[in-house]
C-alpha cells in the first residue's frame, strides 16, 4: 500500500517546461485578482476558480452546483470542479512566456553556474541577457569567434561586411538557450579532465570549478537548457492570499504584485510581437520581462529591488524561504500546536516532585475532547454534541469527570528559552484554583525559572504512545541529573538550604547541653516541650539492626541532626560503618551546605536510583522550608559589622603605594610595572579586609549563615557590604588603580559612586549582547551535530585516544579521574608497579575502577572515543560511553549530537563576553569567554597569535639591538628560525627542548597550524582542551564526550588533492567514509587511489557541508544551498533529525528508529500468551 509520507529519500532538481505544464491546472492569462464588487475571483486571473478550485467547499463559481452530493462534477457553465476549497492550497497554475528568460539563481549566484558551464564571465553573460550586446551563436564561414560579444555598432558592421545570413548572432535568453543546447556534457567533461592534468595555479582552480558544474549536469540528468525558463509556475492562491480589511481595502501577499507585473509585461510583449513592432521596442519589453521574472524569483539580487507602498522591498519567492521568518524556520521546523496553553507560574511547595498545579479552567479547555468522550461513556451525556454543550456551559458534573480524566495523564511544561532538554519536562497535573500554574520549587533550576512573573507553556501529549514516553522519559522526578556533566540539577536552593543548614548547626552552651536520652523520640519530645535547644549537643541511644540482631549505642549529636537524618537513607557512605566507633553514627553528622546537599543527592542517585532520590528530595524540601521559617533568619544593618582592622590595612596599603610611586619616579621600575604592582597591592589588601571580615563575623550572624550555607550571596558580596568594594574597571575594561575604599554599610562618596556605575552599565550591556551571541552559537552547534545518533552497540574499532589531565600552566583544570568515568578502555590498563592488568580492553570504567587507575599512579590512559569511532553515521555506544543524564550506559537511538550541542550552548550565557585588559600588556590580552569558544569552534585564526615550533629540537635565543630571534635545532640538523615581534613574551628559555607544535611565545595557536604540524589528532586534542579551559575557568563543567562529538563533526571532511582512478574531482570536500569507500572500490581493481587530506572546518561551514540539503538550506544561505543541490540533483537520504522534522516524519531517534516501526501497541488489556511474545531487540 502506498503511503504518501512513507518514503526514504527526497530529491531536488531543475524543472523542465513539460514538467511545469504537467503540474499546472491551467494557464493564468490575466493579471486580475478579485472583482471588487462581487468579491469573486476573475476568470483566468491569479485567483481563478477554474484553475485553482472553488473558494467555498462544494460550490461552483456560478452557483449552479451547491452541496456535497455533486462532488467531483465539473460545472458546465463556469468550468469549476465541485470539491473542497482546500485544493486551493495545492493546485498550481502556469504562465506561458512570450520570450524565454534566465533563472536568476543560476545566472547570478556565486559562482555563476551558467557562466561556468558556458565558460563566460558573468559580466559578459549579463550584457547578453539584458540586451546590451549580441553574442555570436554560429560564426559559419566568417572570422568571428563563437560566443564573441558584439555591441550594436560592431553587429551592424559585421552584417554589412559579411552579409545578412553569413553568421548567426542573437541577444537575450534565447541566444543563451541556443548555446546551452549545443553543449556536449560528456565530451566537455573529458576535455576538462585532460586540461586539468597540464594546468596549474589560478587556471587549475577555474577548471576544477567548471568541471564540478559540468559533472553535476552530466550525472544528475538535468538539461542545461532548463536554466532558461519558458514557462513560469504559479503557486497555489491560498499560499499567497488576498484578504479584505475592515475598510473595504484589500491586503495581499507581495507575490501577487510580482506575478501581476510578469503577466502584464508578458501580455504586452505578446501584443507587440503580434503587431510586428520594431526590434528596439520588443527588445526593451523582453528586458523588462526578464527583470520582472528576476524580481519574482529573487527580488533585489540584481539591481534595485522592486518596492511596494512606503518604499518597502517586496518579498519574492526566495525571501519566502529565507531567514527566521521564512518557510523553513517559521513553519516547518517549529509549528504552533493545539492542546496547549500558557500562564504565569507560582511556587507550589506542597507539590510532590512529579506534580504540577494546573488551573481548573485551563485544564478543562486542554482536556476537552477527553472530558467529552468520558461524559458520553459514563452516560452523563447522550451524544458528543450534548457533551460539548455541557463542557461549554461548565456544568458541575464536568469537574468530577475532569478529575478522572487527568489522573495518569501527564502534561508537558516548557519555559522559553529552552536551552537544554530539561527545559521541557512532564508532570502529573493537579487541579488548582486561580489562573496560575504551580511549579515545584526543585524544578526551577532546570528551567532557570523564578516567580517574578515568568510564564510557562503547557502541552498535552495526546496518543497513548506519547503519554507513555512522557511518563517514562520526561517525568521531572526522573530528570535529576544534568545531561552536560552528570551532576544533580535538582539541588535544593535558597530557603531549603538555609533551613537544612540551620537544622544541622551546633551551638556551644545551648539549653540542655550534655543531656542524655533513651531514644530519638524522647529527644525530639524534649525539644518540642522546650526543654532543650535544637542546636544543643546531647547524647542519644540509637538502635540499629546489624546482621539480624538489634543492637544499640550512644552517640553525640543534636536534635536538629536527628530530625534531618530521618529523611536521609543511612547507607550513603559518608560514615565508615566498618569502624566500631562509627557504627551507630548518623549519616549526616556535619553542617549541611548547598555543596554537601549536592553530594548527598549524587550518592543517593547512584545507590538508590531516581525514585527513592526524588522522595528524599521532597522530604528535604519540606524540612528546609519548615525550619527556615522557624529559624527566622533576617538581615539588618546591624548585622554588617565593619572589621576595625580595615583602617590599619588601608593605611599600610597607602604607605606601600607611596613607596612604589617613589621607585617609579626615580626610574627603578617602568610604568607597566608600577601599574601592575599597585593593582596587585590593592587586590591583596581587599582580600585581607574580606578575610578579616569573615573571621570577625559570628557563626550565627544571618548574613554569614546565608553565604556560608550557599543559600544566597557569596563572600565577594559580603566583602562589598561590610568590607570594602575594592578595584573597579573603567569603561574600556582596564582596571582603575584607585579602589573604592568604602563598603555599602559605610556608604560611597560621589567619586566612588561614579566609578562604580561604569561596571554596572557594562554588566547590563554585556548580558544583553551575550544572550544573542550564545543563542546563535547553540543554533550552529545543533546544526552541525543534529544527525549524530547512537546507531549501533559496537563499531569494533581498535583505535582510541590517550587522555591525561588538562593543565593551564601548573593548575589542573580537569582531572584524569573525571575524564575516565563512564568510558571504555581501548587497550589493557596495566599497573606500572606490579604489572597486573587493572582494566582489560573494551571494559567500562565506573567511578570505583577510575579511582583504582588513578591511585595506581597511571598518568595517561587510552580510551574509546567518538573521535575514533568507525560508524559511518553517528557513533556507537562503546565509543560514546556513559549517558550523563542517567549515569548508565547509553541506549541505542539516543540523540547524542543534540545533547552535546545543548550542553555546550546552555552555559554559554554564563561565560564572560569581554577581553580582560590587565593594563595593555601585550600577549596577555587574549580573548576569553564566549568569543574564545566561538573562535575555536569556527576554527578561526585567533587574535594574539602565538608562534609555534614546526619541529622537535633545542632552543637557542639570540637578541640583537634590532630584534629577538629564536632558533630551533632539530636532531637531524634541521634548523628553523622565528623572529619574535616586539612586546611578545617568550614561553621558552635558552637550551629548552621543545616538541613540534609547542608554543614559543604566549598567545593562542591557530588550529590549522596544529593540524599541519601534529595532524588531525593533535588538532582535535587542542580544540578539546582549549574549549574545556574556557568553560572550567568560569566554573562550568562539561563532559569531554560532548566536545568530542562536535569536534569530530568539524573534522569529518576530506579535501581531495589528486583524484587517481576514482570519480572524485580534485579540490572538492567529501565525507571521510565516502572517501575510504571510493578508494576501496578502486583498490579492488588495482587502480590508483585518490589522495586527500583531512580538513578542519568551522561549525558553520561543517553544518553547510552536510549531505542533507534540507538541513543545510534550513540553516543558512538557503538560496545558495538549494541552487547547488538542484544542479547536482541531490538526494537527501533523511538520516538526520532536521530533515525528518521538515517533511513531517518521526525523527529517527529513540522510538522513531526504523527497528521500532513495525511495533503495535496492545492497548486493549488483553493478556499476551507466553509463547506468542517475541523479544524485541
From Swiss-Prot:
Signal peptide: none annotated. Binds 1 Mg(2+) ion per subunit. Binds 2 Zn(2+) ions per subunit. Zn(2+) 2 binds at residues 795, 869, 876, 879. The keyword Transcription applies. Mg(2+) binds at residues 450, 452, 454. Pfam families: RNA_pol_Rpb1_1 (PF04997), RNA_pol_Rpb1_2 (PF00623), RNA_pol_Rpb1_3 (PF04983), RNA_pol_Rpb1_4 (PF05000), RNA_pol_Rpb1_5 (PF04998). It catalyses: RNA(n) + a ribonucleoside 5'-triphosphate = RNA(n+1) + diphosphate. Keywords: DNA-directed RNA polymerase, Magnesium, Metal-binding, Nucleotidyltransferase, Transcription, Transferase, Zinc. Its cofactor is Mg(2+); Zn(2+). SUPFAM superfamilies: beta and beta-prime subunits of DNA dependent RNA-polymerase (SSF64484). GO terms for biological process: DNA-templated transcription. Gene3D superfamilies: 1.10.132.30, 1.10.150.390, 1.10.1790.20, 1.10.40.90, 2.40.40.20, 2.40.50.100, RNA polymerase II, clamp domain (4.10.860.120), RNA polymerase Rpb1, domain 3 (1.10.274.100). Coiled coil: none annotated. One of its GO terms (molecular function) is magnesium ion binding. Its EC number is 2.7.7.6. It comes from the Bacteria. Belongs to the RNA polymerase beta' chain family. The RNAP catalytic core consists of 2 alpha, 1 beta, 1 beta' and 1 omega subunit. When a sigma factor is associated with the core the holoenzyme is formed, which can initiate transcription. DNA-dependent RNA polymerase catalyzes the transcription of DNA into RNA using the four ribonucleoside triphosphates as substrates. This is DNA-directed RNA polymerase subunit beta'. It comes from Clostridium botulinum (strain Eklund 17B / Type B). The lineage of its organism: Bacteria, Bacillati, Bacillota, Clostridia, Eubacteriales.
Amino acid at each position: 500500500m502506498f503511503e504518501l509520507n512513507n518514503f526514504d529519500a527526497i530529491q531536488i532538481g531543475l524543472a523542465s517546461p513539460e514538467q511545469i505544464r504537467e503540474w499546472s491546472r491551467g494557464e493564468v492569462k490575466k493579471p486580475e485578482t478579485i472583482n471588487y464588487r462581487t468579491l469573486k475571483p476573475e476568470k483566468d486571473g491569479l485567483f481563478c476558480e477554474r484553475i485553482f478550485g472553488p473558494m467555498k467547499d462544494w460550490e461552483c463559481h456560478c452557483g449552479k452546483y451547491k452541496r456535497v452530493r455533486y462532488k467531483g462534477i465539473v460545472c458546465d457553465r463556469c468550468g469549476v470542479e465541485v470539491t473542497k476549497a482546500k485544493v486551493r492550497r495545492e493546485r498550481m497554475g502556469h504562465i506561458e512566456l512570450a520570450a524565454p528568460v534566465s533563472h536568476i539563481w543560476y545566472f547570478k549566484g556565486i559562482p555563476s553556474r551558467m557562466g561556468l558551464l558556458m565558460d563566460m564571465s558573468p559580466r559578459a553573460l549579463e550584457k547578453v541577457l539584458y540586451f546590451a550586446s549580441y553574442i555570436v551563436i554560429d560564426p559559419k564561414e566568417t572570422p568571428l569567434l563563437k560566443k564573441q560579444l558584439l555591441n550594436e555598432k560592431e553587429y551592424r558592421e559585421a552584417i554589412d561586411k559579411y552579409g545578412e545570413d553569413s553568421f548567426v548572432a542573437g541577444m537575450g535568453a534565447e541566444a543563451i538557450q541556443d548555446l546551452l543546447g549545443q553543449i556536449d556534457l560528456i565530451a566537455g567533461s573529458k576535455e576538462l579532465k585532460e586540461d586539468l592534468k597540464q594546468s596549474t595555479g589560478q587556471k587549475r582552480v577555474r577548471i576544477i570549478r567548471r568541471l564540478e558544474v559540468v559533472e553535476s549536469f552530466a550525472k544528475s540528468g538535468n538539461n542545461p537548457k532548463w536554466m532558461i525558463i519558458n514557462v513560469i509556475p504559479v503557486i497555489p492562491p491560498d499560499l499567497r492570499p488576498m484578504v479584505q480589511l475592515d475598510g473595504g481595502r484589500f491586503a495581499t501577499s507581495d507575490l501577487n504584485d510580482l506575478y501581476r507585473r510578469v503577466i502584464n509585461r508578458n501580455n504586452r510583449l505578446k501584443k507587440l510581437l503580434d503587431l510586428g513592432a520594431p526590434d528596439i521596442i520588443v527588445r526593451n519589453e523582453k528586458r523588462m520581462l526578464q527583470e520582472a521574472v528576476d524580481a519574482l524569483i529573487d527580488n533585489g539580487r540584481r539591481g534595485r529591488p522592486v518596492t511596494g507602498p512606503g518604499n518597502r522591498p517586496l518579498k519574492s519567492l526566495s525571501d519566502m524561504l529565507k531567514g527566521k521568518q521564512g518557510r523553513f524556520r517559521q513553519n516547518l521546523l517549529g509549528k504552533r500546536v493545539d492542546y496547549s496553553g500558557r500562564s504565569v507560574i507560582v511556587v507550589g511547595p506542597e507539590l510532590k516532585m512529579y506534580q504540577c498545579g494546573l488551573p481548573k479552567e485551563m485544564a478543562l479547555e486542554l482536556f476537552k475532547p477527553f472530558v467529552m468522550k468520558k461524559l458520553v461513556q459514563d452516560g452523563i451525556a447522550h451524544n458528543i454534541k450534548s457533551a460539548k454543550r455541557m463542557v461549554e456551559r461548565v456544568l458541575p458534573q464536568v469537574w468530577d469527570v475532569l478529575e478522572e480524566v487527568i489522573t495518569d495523564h501527564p502534561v508537558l511544561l516548557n519555559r522559553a528559552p529552552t536551552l537544554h532538554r530539561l527545559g521541557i519536562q512532564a508532570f502529573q497535573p493537579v487541579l488548582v484554583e486561580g489562573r496560575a500554574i504551580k511549579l515545584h520549587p526543585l524544578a526551577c533550576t532546570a528551567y532557570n525559572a523564578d516567580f517574578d512573573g515568568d510564564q510557562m507553556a503547557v502541552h498535552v501529549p495526546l496518543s497513548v504512545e506519547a503519554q507513555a514516553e512522557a511518563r517514562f522519559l520526561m517525568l521531572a522526578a526522573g530528570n535529576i541529573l544534568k545531561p552536560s556533566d552528570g551532576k544533580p540539577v535538582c539541588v535544593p536552593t535558597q530557603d531549603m538550604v538555609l533551613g537544612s543548614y540551620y537544622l544541622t548547626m551546633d551551638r556551644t552552651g545551648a539549653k540542655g547541653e550534655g543531656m542524655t536520652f533513651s531514644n530519638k523520640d524522647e529527644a525530639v519530645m524534649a525539644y518540642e516541650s522546650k526543654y532543650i535547644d535544637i542546636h544543643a549537643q546531647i547524647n542519644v541511644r540509637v538502635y540499629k539492626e546489624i546482621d539480624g540482631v538489634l543492637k544499640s549505642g550512644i552517640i553525640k549529636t543534636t536534635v536538629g541532626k536527628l530530625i534531618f537524618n530521618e529523611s536521609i537513607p543511612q547507607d550513603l557512605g559518608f560514615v565508615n560503618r566498618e569502624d566500631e566507633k562509627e557504627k551507630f553514627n548518623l549519616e549526616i553528622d556535619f553542617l549541611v551546605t548547598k555543596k554537601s546537599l549536592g553530594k548527598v543527592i549524587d550518592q543517593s542517585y547512584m545507590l538508590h536510583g531516581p525514585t527513592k532520590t526524588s522522595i528524599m528530595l521532597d522530604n528535604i524540601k519540606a524540612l528546609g522550608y519548615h525550619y527556615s521559617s522557624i529559624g527566622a533568619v533576617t538581615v539588618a544593618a546591624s548585622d554588617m559589622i565593619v572589621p576595625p582592622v580595615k583602617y590599619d590595612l588601608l593605611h599600610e596599603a597607602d604607605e606601600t603605594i607611596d613607596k612604589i610611586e617613589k621607585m617609579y619616579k626615580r626610574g627603578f621600575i617602568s610604568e607597566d610595572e608600577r601599574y601592575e604592582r599597585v593593582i596587585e597591592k590593592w587586590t591583596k589588601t581587599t582580600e585581607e579586609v574580606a578575610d578579616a571580615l569573615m573571621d570577625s563575623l559570628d557563626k550565627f550572624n544571618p548574613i554569614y549563615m546565608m553565604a556560608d550555607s550557599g543559600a544566597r550571596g557569596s563572600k565577594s558580596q559580603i566583602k562589598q557590604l561590610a568590607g570594602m568594594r575594592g578595584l573597579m574597571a573603567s569603561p574600556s575594561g582596564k582596571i582603575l588603580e584607585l579602589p573604592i575604599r568604602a563598603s555599602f554599610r559605610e556608604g560611597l562618596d560621589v567619586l566612588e559612586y561614579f566609578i562604580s556605575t561604569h561596571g554596572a552599565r557594562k554588566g547590563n550591556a554585556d548580558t544583553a549582547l551575550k544572550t544573542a551571541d550564545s543563542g546563535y552559537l547553540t543554533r550552529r552547534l545543533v546544526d552541525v551535530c543534529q544527525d549524530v545518533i547512537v546507531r549501533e552497540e559496537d563499531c569494533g574499532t581498535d583505535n582510541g585516544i590517550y587522555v591525561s589531565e588538562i593543565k593551564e600552566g601548573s593548575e589542573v583544570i580537569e582531572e584524569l579521574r573525571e575524564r575516565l568515568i563512564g568510558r571504555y578502555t581501548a587497550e589493557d590498563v596495566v599497573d606500572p608497579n606490579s604489572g597486573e592488568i587493572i582494566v582489560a580492553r573494551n571494559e567500562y570504567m565506573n567511578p570505583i575502577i577510575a579511582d583504582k587507575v588513578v591511585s595506581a599512579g597511571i598518568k595517561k590512559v587510552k580510551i574509546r572515543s567518538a573521535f575514533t569511532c568507525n560508524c559511518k553515521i553517528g557513533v556507537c555506544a562503546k565509543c560514546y560511553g556513559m549517558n550523563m543524564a542517567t549515569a548508565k550506559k547509553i541506549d541505542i537511538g539516543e540523540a547524542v549530537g543534540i545533547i552535546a550541542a545543548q550542553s555546550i550552548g546552555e552555559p554559554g550565557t554564563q561565560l564572560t563576553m569581554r577581553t580582560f585588559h590587565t593594563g595593555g600588556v601585550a600577549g596577555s590580552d587574549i580573548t576569553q569567554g564566549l568569543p574564545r569558544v566561538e573562535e575555536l569552534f569556527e576554527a578561526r585564526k585567533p587574535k594574539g597569535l602565538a608562534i609555534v615550533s614546526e619541529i622537535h629540537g633545542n632552543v637557542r635565543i639570540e637578541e640583537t639591538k634590532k630584534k629577538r630571534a629564536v632558533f630551533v635545532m632539530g636532531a637531524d640538523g634541521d634548523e628553523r628560525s622565528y623572529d619574535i615581534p616586539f612586546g611578545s613574551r617568550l614561553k621558552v628559555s635558552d637550551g629548552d627542548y621543545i616538541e613540534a607544535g609547542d608554543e614559543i611565545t604566549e598567545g593562542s595557536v591557530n588550529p590549522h597550524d596544529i593540524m599541519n604540524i601534529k595532524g588531525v589528532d593533535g588538532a582535535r586534542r587542542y580544540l578539546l582542551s582549549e574549549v574545556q579551559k574556557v568553560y572550567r575557568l568560569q566554573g562550568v563543567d562539561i563532559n569531554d564526550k560532548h566536545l568530542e562529538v562536535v569536534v569530530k563533526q568539524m573534522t569529518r571532511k576530506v579535501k581531495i588533492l589528486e583524484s587517481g582512478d576514482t570519480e572524485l574531482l580534485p579540490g572538492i570536500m567529501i565525507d571521510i567514509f565516502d572517501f575510504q569507500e571510493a578508494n576501496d572500490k578502486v583498490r579492488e581493481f588495482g587502480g590508483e587511489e585518490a589522495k586527500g587530506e583531512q580538513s578542519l572546518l568551522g561549525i558553520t561551514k561543517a553544518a553547510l557541508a552536510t549531505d542533507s540539503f534540507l538541513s543545510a538550506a534550513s540553516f543558512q544561505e538557503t538560496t545558495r544551498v538549494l541552487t547547488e543541490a538542484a544542479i547536482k540533483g541531490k538526494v537527501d537520504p533523511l538520516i538526520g533529525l532536521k530533515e525528518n522534522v521538515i517533511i513531517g516524519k518521526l525523527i529517527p531517534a529513540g522510538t522513531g528508529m526504523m527497528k521500532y516501526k513495525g511495533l503495535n501497541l496492545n492497548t486493549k488489556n488483553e493478556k499476551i500468551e507466553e509463547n506468542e511474545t517475541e523479544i524485541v531487540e
